[in-house]
Amino acid sequence: MIGSLKLNLILALSLSVVHVIWSYPVLSSKVPGKPDYFLILLSTCPARLEGSDGLAFLKPILEKTSMKRSFRNGVGSGVKKTSFRRAKQ
C-alpha cells in the first residue's frame, strides 16, 4: 500500500516537473543581431548516443524558439510590462 502510494507520488511529481520544463520559455539573446551562443553550441556539437542523432528531437523546438524571439521593438523575452514596472524605471 505504502509502496504504491510512493510510486504514484513520484509519478505525479515527475509529470508535473516535465510539464514545467517543457512549458518554460527558452531564454534568447536580448540584443538584436547577436547570435544565441547556446543554440550555436547545440547545433555544432552533436551528441554520440549509440549511433543515433542525439539532438534531432531538439531541432524543431530550437527552430521554433529562434523564429519567435523577435517581439515588439526587438525585446526577446516577450514579457509585457505592467504599469508598476514602467513606474519603477
From Swiss-Prot:
One GO location term (cellular component): extracellular region
UniProt organism field: Rattus norvegicus (Rat)
Keyword terms, alphabetized: Cleavage on pair of basic residues, Neuropeptide, Secreted, Signal
Residues of the signal peptide: 1-23
Domain of life: Eukaryota
The keyword Membrane is annotated on this UniProt entry: no
Subcellular location: Secreted
InterPro entries assigned to the protein according to its UniProt record, in alphabetical order: Neuropeptide_S
Functional description taken from the UniProt entry: May play an important anorexigenic role. Modulates arousal and anxiety as well as increases locomotor activity. Binds to its receptor NPSR1 with nanomolar affinity to increase intracellular calcium concentrations.
Tissues in which the UniProt entry reports expression: Expressed in mammary, salivary and thyroid gland. Expressed in the brain, in a cluster of cells located between the locus coeruleus (LC) and Barrington's nucleus, as well as in few cells of the dorsomedial hypothalamic nucleus and the amygdala.
Protein name: Neuropeptide S
Record GO biological process: neuropeptide signaling pathway; positive regulation of action potential; positive regulation of circadian sleep/wake cycle, wakefulness; positive regulation of synaptic transmission, GABAergic; positive regulation of synaptic transmission, glutamatergic; synaptic transmission, glutamatergic; visual learning
Propeptide span(s): 24-69
